[in-house]
């Protein structure tokens, strides 16, 4: 008779424990009910990136001295620097500079180690294309100034959202 009573007690304890676990899960679900939604409607709303966000690289052609430090510190030897040695002034003259963003890992080493600060990271992250060859940016495409998300009037940022009345 005692084994049946102990089995019944164990069954009751397991039932109470299961109900407690279900209640804990339900309380967590209810605690999320009064939070603001995290999802943004992407093409029309964008998150404002942080100050140190590593997006598309901006290149200033006039500042570059063709030292190729960016190529040496890049883990995948990505930037292509074409230069010509000017014999009369004994300096390098930059002819072409390009980066393939289809291969770039956005580590930021080139920006960090550039001695003339001709490279900088922007907050631009929309680089998707239908053709991978369009991701190979030359010095003209790299020199294009990025439009700030805050200044873009077609985009509603999280800061510009109407307040939700509670």
From Swiss-Prot:
Cofactor(s) annotated in UniProt: [4Fe-4S] cluster
GO cellular component, one term: chloroplast thylakoid membrane
Domain of life: Eukaryota
Membrane topology recorded in Swiss-Prot or TrEMBL: Peripheral membrane protein
Domain 4Fe-4S ferredoxin-type: 55-84, 95-124
Disulfide bonds: none
Cleavable signal peptide: none
Class of this enzyme: translocase
EC id: 7.1.1.-
Residues binding [4Fe-4S] cluster 1, per UniProt: 64, 67, 70, 114
Catalytic activity: a plastoquinone + NADH + (n+1) H(+)(in) = a plastoquinol + NAD(+) + n H(+)(out); a plastoquinone + NADPH + (n+1) H(+)(in) = a plastoquinol + NADP(+) + n H(+)(out)
GO MF term list: 4 iron, 4 sulfur cluster binding; iron ion binding; NADH dehydrogenase (ubiquinone) activity; quinone binding
Database matches in InterPro entries: 4Fe4S_Fe-S-bd, 4Fe4S_Fe_S_CS, NADH_quinone_OxRdtase_chainI, NDHI
Residues binding [4Fe-4S] cluster 2: 74, 104, 107, 110
Cross-referenced Gene3D superfamilies: 3.30.70.3270
GO annotation (BP), single: photosynthesis, light reaction
Keywords of the record: 4Fe-4S, Chloroplast, Iron, Iron-sulfur, Membrane, Metal-binding, NAD, NADP, Plastid, Plastoquinone, Quinone, Repeat, Thylakoid, Translocase
Compartment(s) where it occurs, according to its Swiss-Prot or TrEMBL record: Plastid, Chloroplast thylakoid membrane
Cofactor binding notes: Binds 2 [4Fe-4S] clusters per subunit.
Similarity field: Belongs to the complex I 23 kDa subunit family.
PANTHER family in UniProt: NAD(P)H-QUINONE OXIDOREDUCTASE SUBUNIT I, CHLOROPLASTIC
Record's function text: NDH shuttles electrons from NAD(P)H:plastoquinone, via FMN and iron-sulfur (Fe-S) centers, to quinones in the photosynthetic chain and possibly in a chloroplast respiratory chain. The immediate electron acceptor for the enzyme in this species is believed to be plastoquinone. Couples the redox reaction to proton translocation, and thus conserves the redox energy in a proton gradient.
NCBIfam families: ndhI, NuoI, PRK05888.1-3
Self-association state and partner proteins as the record states: NDH is composed of at least 16 different subunits, 5 of which are encoded in the nucleus.
Protein name: NAD(P)H-quinone oxidoreductase subunit I, chloroplastic
